Amino acid sequence: MAPSNLPESTTPAEVPAPYGTGPAAAAQAASAAGRKPISRVRIHHLQQAKDNGEHFAMLTAYEQYTAEIFDQAGIEVLLVGDSASNNVYGNETSLPVTVDELLPLTRAVSRSAKRALIVADLPFGSYEVSPGQAVATGVRFLKEGLAHAVKIEGTAYYADTVRAMVQAGIPVMAHIGFTPQSEHSLGGYRVQGRGDDAQRLVDDAVALQDAGAFSVLMEMVPAETAAAVDAALRVPTVGIGAGKTTTGQVLVWQDMAGLRGGKMAKFVKQYADLRTTLSDAAAAYGEDVRSGQFPGPEHSF
């Protein structure tokens, strides 16, 4: 998905074609339209995308170099997800990862990305007890992790939690549909929002929006249901396995770039094969070392 050129300040009639090839293209398009290019993506830019029928891209990031690369490629939002549990720490699910494990990753991404909006997941067990617990955890991610916003999973039950966090100055993205932190209660990785359950998702999304969430992310939701949710909301939506009507799309970067290997989820589009590239590079390095070809004279002092 090409990065969008979100406007700094514009009306719908003034919006040019939103697709470029990163900040340079975005700056050129903004200049041609007589607008100031975006130096830092903010929440209101995502809202403008929703209002103007544009789209934005979101990827996970967990450390310096991917944050820099994705930021320079024009990705508007970087998510320091609790998926780090699976993709960094080697766990089978997102449940074991802790606040203290996610904070250093969030800090690294926030320090490295100069333009993207940084959203951090609140991990399982860090916000469910009470709105007060959620506020305290959210403050840590903004203060210690340098994030710009946080994401929490849940239904309309968490509307009071979202409201308390927003009132405390913590921007919140809500996550509905399949929520990985609830995989055991949901019966595993299953599509949500089919049949009679579709209206519940719409109601959850509206309740979380009305509580102050600046965006609603939907995971593994039928395209028709996701379209109904998007139509019911004023705020931008983000999809992962939720069709194409959402304002934004998000993928785990290791899936997008082909690092994970193995069978991918249906909603993943793989844009590279980094697993093969890195494996070939490591094998070639090992062979050069064992054969005495590395280091050569050009690598020695």
UniProtKB/Swiss-Prot annotation:
Its EC number is 2.1.2.11. Keywords: Cytoplasm, Magnesium, Metal-binding, Pantothenate biosynthesis, Transferase. One of its GO terms (cellular component) is cytoplasm. GO terms for molecular function: 3-methyl-2-oxobutanoate hydroxymethyltransferase activity; magnesium ion binding. The active site is at 219 (proton acceptor). Its main location: cytoplasm. GO terms for biological process: pantothenate biosynthetic process. Residues 1-12 have a biased composition (Polar residues). Its cofactor is Mg(2+). Pathway: Cofactor biosynthesis; (R)-pantothenate biosynthesis; (R)-pantoate from 3-methyl-2-oxobutanoate: step 1/2. InterPro entries: Pantoate_hydroxy_MeTrfase (IPR003700), Pyrv/PenolPyrv_kinase-like_dom (IPR015813), Pyrv_kinase-like_dom_sf (IPR040442). Binds 1 Mg(2+) ion per subunit. It comes from the Bacteria. It is found in: Cytoplasm. Residues 1-24 are annotated as: Disordered. 3-methyl-2-oxobutanoate binds at residues 82-83, 121, 151. Mg(2+) binds at residues 82, 121, 153. It catalyses: 3-methyl-2-oxobutanoate + (6R)-5,10-methylene-5,6,7,8-tetrahydrofolate + H2O = 2-dehydropantoate + (6S)-5,6,7,8-tetrahydrofolate. Homodecamer; pentamer of dimers. NCBIfam families: panB, PRK00311.1. Belongs to the PanB family. Catalyzes the reversible reaction in which hydroxymethyl group from 5,10-methylenetetrahydrofolate is transferred onto alpha-ketoisovalerate to form ketopantoate. This is 3-methyl-2-oxobutanoate hydroxymethyltransferase.
